[in-house]
């Protein structure tokens, strides 16, 4: 049927009027602390630190999340020796986006229900929810 996958849903205000689990509060507090440290960056700037940031981003974001969590573990796009699979997965853990099994199961569930009301990081809940808010909610990510 034409346009059968179009949904009309109302935002559920997942951030307001809810009880936050202790793990959610701890994660949010930690993220606020880390981002608060960034306020010191203009006063402590150095080019070696920019280089360290770029290397850290490559290790955690590119190798850990994109290559390991997403391509290797979620989609099984390629295989590596177990020692390398574990090393790459550890790089993903350093990105502070959760444990590999948790991230992979959430991502696979997302692909089962992409852009529907059942999507754990649905765009129907808004830009911030679909990009990062779902990470702050233990009920959605587990």
Model-derived segments and spans:
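Non-catalytic, topology-defining segments of multipass membrane proteins
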Residues: 1-142
